């Protein structure tokens, strides 16, 4: 008997690279989206850390009054931020090579654009990588669909809103207090609290938290005991076991009696789809709300107060909200504007055009 051995041709470096990138046997899956995700997220993270620590003040309003955001210029972890690029730059793409010098690039807030653009590309690729890994493993694509909710929210805040407002200086600062400042100014200029899409987003986030807590507590309370009373119930679960780890019938019966029968799911698959869909849809609506308000399609306003038959104002919550918004707007960009538009567009006050004659 004769055995013939044929030497296998060695794969090229490109083929080896392709096999490594798409292999699901790696400890961490890379994927084709990962080849772009890894460098962009590393770039964004590195630039953010350096800018947060040591970036010089930025002329955010374009009026030659720089605002310091880094730690070395007097801020702490709470007040520090990567300050958005200058209003003098507007929506222009502002990479390092567009500036006359590195100092000019830093003064005009170039690091903000670098971090934001690299970060957005990175999270887009992360979402694509989730789909890619699901496809390789034969899974359904709902993981990347769920992740599209925070991706759409970040895109609305960092890209769509500055485009609608005409300048990246209106983007959200990359810091804790900068985030809150952005929220307050957004309320002042767009009345987001009175926008129905924001209300749906609040229902999605808080409702999702409630449903998650309810589900986790119900499951934990109806675990099937596989251990003695002196051992933790967690030891009764073996990874990959075929048996149910909790009694869904008991959980269904408890919740159905606690509220009413049809408030409880009797199908585990529909239950978990609901738990995933509720917050995702809510955050989608919030992202759509921010994207529409970016072009000044704002929340409901009740600027006309309710008057009685004598013409006196009947105070309502809308009046309180309007005064708060005007107060926020007065504090915002106080050196760039004299008055917010709500105050500047009121009735004109009579002024003296000629000086009175003084006879001494």
Curated annotation (Swiss-Prot):
Fe cation binds at residues 215, 272. CDD domains: Photosystem-II_D1. The chain crosses the membrane at residues 29-46, 118-133, 142-156, 197-218, 274-288. The record marks 344-345 as: Cleavage. It catalyses: 2 a plastoquinone + 4 hnu + 2 H2O = 2 a plastoquinol + O2. It is an enzyme of class 1 (oxidoreductase). The D1/D2 heterodimer binds P680, chlorophylls that are the primary electron donor of PSII, and subsequent electron acceptors. It shares a non-heme iron and each subunit binds pheophytin, quinone, additional chlorophylls, carotenoids and lipids. D1 provides most of the ligands for the Mn4-Ca-O5 cluster of the oxygen-evolving complex (OEC). There is also a Cl(-1) ion associated with D1 and D2, which is required for oxygen evolution. The PSII complex binds additional chlorophylls, carotenoids and specific lipids. It is a multi-pass membrane protein. A quinone binds at residues 215, 264-265. It is found in: Cellular thylakoid membrane. Changing residue 266 to T: IoxI; herbicide resistance. It comes from the Bacteria. Tyr-161 forms a radical intermediate that is referred to as redox-active TyrZ, YZ or Y-Z. GO terms for molecular function: chlorophyll binding; electron transporter, transferring electrons within the cyclic electron transport pathway of photosynthesis activity; iron ion binding; oxidoreductase activity, acting on diphenols and related substances as donors, oxygen as acceptor; oxygen evolving activity. Changing residue 211 to S: Az-V; herbicide resistance. GO terms for cellular component: photosystem II; plasma membrane-derived thylakoid membrane. Pheophytin a binds at residue 126. One of its GO terms (biological process) is response to herbicide. The keyword Transmembrane applies. Photosystem II (PSII) is a light-driven water:plastoquinone oxidoreductase that uses light energy to abstract electrons from H(2)O, generating O(2) and a proton gradient subsequently used for ATP formation. It consists of a core antenna complex that captures photons, and an electron transfer chain that converts photonic excitation into a charge separation. The D1/D2 (PsbA/PsbD) reaction center heterodimer binds P680, the primary electron donor of PSII as well as several subsequent electron acceptors. PSII is composed of 1 copy each of membrane proteins PsbA, PsbB, PsbC, PsbD, PsbE, PsbF, PsbH, PsbI, PsbJ, PsbK, PsbL, PsbM, PsbT, PsbX, PsbY, PsbZ, Psb30/Ycf12, peripheral proteins PsbO, CyanoQ (PsbQ), PsbU, PsbV and a large number of cofactors. It forms dimeric complexes. Cyanobacteria usually contain more than 2 copies of the psbA gene. This is Photosystem II protein D1. It comes from Synechocystis sp. (strain PCC 6714).
